[in-house]
Structure formats: C-alpha cells, structure tokens
Swiss-Prot record:
Alphabetized UniProt keyword annotations: Amino-acid biosynthesis, Cytoplasm, Histidine biosynthesis, Isomerase
This protein's name: 1-(5-phosphoribosyl)-5-[(5-phosphoribosylamino)methylideneamino] imidazole-4-carboxamide isomerase
Chief subcellular location: cytoplasm
Top-level taxon of origin: Bacteria
Active site, UniProt feature: D8 (proton acceptor), D129 (proton donor)
Catalytic activity: 1-(5-phospho-beta-D-ribosyl)-5-[(5-phospho-beta-D-ribosylamino)methylideneamino]imidazole-4-carboxamide = 5-[(5-phospho-1-deoxy-D-ribulos-1-ylimino)methylamino]-1-(5-phospho-beta-D-ribosyl)imidazole-4-carboxamide
MF-aspect GO terms: 1-(5-phosphoribosyl)-5-[(5-phosphoribosylamino)methylideneamino]imidazole-4-carboxamide isomerase activity
Family: Belongs to the HisA/HisF family.
Location in or out of the cell: Cytoplasm
Annotated organism of origin: Bacillus cereus (strain B4264)
InterPro entries in the cross-refs: Aldolase_TIM, His_biosynth, HisA_bact_arch, Isoase_HisA-like, Isoase_HisA-like_bact, RibuloseP-bd_barrel
Keyword Cytoplasm: yes
Pathway: Amino-acid biosynthesis; L-histidine biosynthesis; L-histidine from 5-phospho-alpha-D-ribose 1-diphosphate: step 4/9
HAMAP family named among the record's database cross-references: HisA
Length: 239
C-alpha cells in the first residue's frame, strides 16, 4: 500500500482544513518546502499536494511553491487543485510534478479529460470528492447531482487508471475514513483507489490495506501525531 503524506497549500503556507471549510483552517507549517523535506527524511516515498487557492480560482496559484518542493525533494510529487486545462497540466509536469489530479474538470470538461488521459496516461489521476454520496466541485463549494459511483464508472470508461476518493465530511476530522463508501466504490470499478479523509490511526490504515485499497492520503493525523509516519510506512511494508 502506498502512503501519501499530504501538504495542503493556502497563501503559500501548509494548512489543514476541517471538513473542507476554508474558514476553518489551521496553519501546520509556514514553510511547505521544509515540511516536504521533513516527510522525505521520515521515509515518505511520494507526496500529495493540494493547491487550495487554485481549487477556488480554477488555476494554479501556488506554482512557485510547488516548483520549489519538487526541486527540494527526490521523491515523486502528485498535485491537485485548480487544474482545468492542458496548459496547466503541462506546466506542472514541466516543473517536476510526477502526477496531476483533476477534479472539477473531470466532471464538467470530458473532452479535456479524455485528451489529458490520451497524452499523459497514468500521470492523470481523477479526484472524486463527495458529500452525502454526491460529487462536490470547485474547491468543495458546489455540490452536483452526480453520485460518486456514477462519476467513477465514467472515469474508468474514459481510461483513467487511478482515483482519489475523499469523503468531505470526514476530511480533517480524525474520525476514520468512510469504509462503507470505499467498499462500494471498490465493488463498482476495477481501477486503483486512493483513500482520503478522516484517517486517524494505524488501525485505519491496516483496515484499508486489508480491503486492498491501493493507497491512503494522510494529513492531519501526521501533523497531530496520532500516526507516526515511520511506523506506518514500516507496518504497510510488512502487510
């Protein structure tokens, strides 16, 4: 199982939100580059970065910080947030980003998604963020009438190989992932699933591993030290 330490960027800082609400932010580190280096030194093999400002604006607003992170670490970096054009994808890949996560664009611009998958194949990941089972977009501010299962099936049919699934109600809560929705999603599609939101303990990670979930994104639990990164990396290697 892949472990993805999370760095959420807002105004150039590393922050955490509570249930996706921008008004409920906590600054975890004023220096995201330093945080990325910390994660790498602890053994992280890949980083998950979200440009929160970009998710709202519809364009990458933290590109200089993302570029600095890519130059500062030797491990791969995947990035999401506000990526809604091929130019944006190409720009991120050109500064050293390994994989790009498309969210809003996956729902509203299928032709862009298809072209991105055609050009960049496994480098394109789709992020499905759900609230009460329905897909949320534009930085989680808008709720659609599309179910997360329906969108996942569409993505699979378009050649997407990996999905990041986030239950917004769990994000930043340390209340545990939504295992039920993840299990249903796993039954519905045959592509890689990365779980995000609510992971609070090594037991949560073990349960996801037992479900054969491909990867898990861990944010608040690492910053609040309810999960030790070195320990969880060791545990997942032994499983």
């Amino acid at each position: 199982m892949e472990i993805f330490p999370a760095i959420d960027l807002k105004e150039g800082r590393c922050v955490r939100l509570y249930q996706g609400e921008f008004s409920k932010e906590t600054v975890m580190n004023e220096d995201p580059v330093a945080q990325a280096i910390i994660f790498e030194k602890l053994g992280a093999e890949i980083l998950h970065i979200v440009d929160l400002d970009g998710a709202i604006a519809g364009e990458s607003l933290n590109l200089p910080v993302i570029e600095k992170i890519c130059k500062a670490v030797r491990i791969p970096v995947q990035v999401g947030g506000g990526i809604r054009s091929l130019v944006a994808v190409e720009k991120l890949l050109s500064v050293g980003v390994e994989k790009v996560i498309l969210g809003t664009a996956a729902l509203y611009d299928k032709s862009f998604l298809e072209e991105a998958v055609r050009l960049y194949k496994e480098k394109i990941i789709v992020g499905i963020d759900a609230k009460n089972g329905f897909v949320a977009t534009r930085g989680w501010l808008d709720l659609s009438e599309i179910s997360y299962i329906s969108l996942a099936k569409q993505m699979e049919s378009l050649g997407v190989q990996t999905i990041v699934f986030t239950d917004i109600s769990k994000d930043g809560t340390l209340a545990g992932p939504n295992f039920e929705q993840l299990a249903l999603l796993q039954k519905s599609v045959g592509i890689r699933l990365i779980a995000s939101g609510g992971v609070a303990s090594i037991q949560d990670v073990k349960k996801l591993n037992d479900m054969n979930i491909y990867g898990v994104i861990i944010g608040k639990a690492l910053y609040e030290k309810t999960i030790d990164l070195e320990e969880v990396l060791q545990v997942t290697k032994l499983c």
